[in-house]
């Protein structure tokens, strides 16, 4: 079990690193090509304000999330808050996706995106459990 606790910070960093990469790619996609990104979901942007809103709502927020999560990679003491942040963001996004599927119907695009969201949510929860366990183990074995 000691081995697991020793490698937990690196496993959780891997999880946070994956989230950082995903949030960055999503953010950059919508900031650099909001019209193309929206068109892939059959959304048309009919004005400059609509394009800017797409850049901000779908690009800037995920990029901001990426920066927050990346900053949590730098210190072992910030791993758990980063994992909680990630679980919260992905959990809310997954819940909204499920709500959309229930209310609006199971569009293939929505179902396709649900899989990686659920996987990322599961990874973040596993990360929270591992890091919490590591901290508990550390407290009981150093006191």
Question: What are the functions of these language-model segments?
Answer:
Residues 51-71, 88, 92:
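Core segments of alpha-helical transmembrane spans in multipass integral membrane proteins
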Residues 1-22:
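Cytosolic juxtamembrane helix and N-cap/initiation of the first transmembrane helix
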Residues 22-52:
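Hydrophobic transmembrane helix segments
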Residues 67-81:
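Juxtamembrane helix-break-helix junctions at the cytosolic face
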Residues 106-117:
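Non-cytosolic membrane-interface motifs at loop->transmembrane helix junctions
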Residues 25, 89-99:
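Aromatic-anchored segments of alpha-helical transmembrane domains
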Residues 85-89, 113:
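Alpha-helical transmembrane segments of multi-pass membrane proteins, especially transporters
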Residues 120-139, 143:
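Membrane-water interface at the C-terminal end of transmembrane alpha helices
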């Amino acid at each position: 079990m000691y081995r697991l606790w020793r490698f937990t910070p690196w496993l959780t960093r891997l999880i946070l690193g994956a989230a950082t990469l995903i949030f960055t790619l999503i953010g950059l996609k919508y900031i650099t090509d909001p019209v193309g990104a929206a068109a892939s979901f059959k959304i048309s942007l009919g004005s400059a304000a609509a394009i800017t809103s797409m850049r901000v709502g779908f690009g800037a927020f995920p990029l901001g999330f990426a920066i927050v999560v990346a900053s949590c990679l730098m210190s072992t003491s910030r791993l758990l808050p980063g994992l909680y942040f990630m679980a919260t963001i992905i959990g809310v996004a997954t819940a909204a996706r499920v709500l959309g599927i229930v209310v609006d119907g199971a569009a293939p695009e929505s179902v396709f995106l649900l899989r990686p969201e659920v996987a990322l949510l599961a990874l973040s929860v596993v990360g929270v459990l591992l890091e919490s366990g590591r901290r508990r183990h550390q407290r009981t074995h150093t006191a």
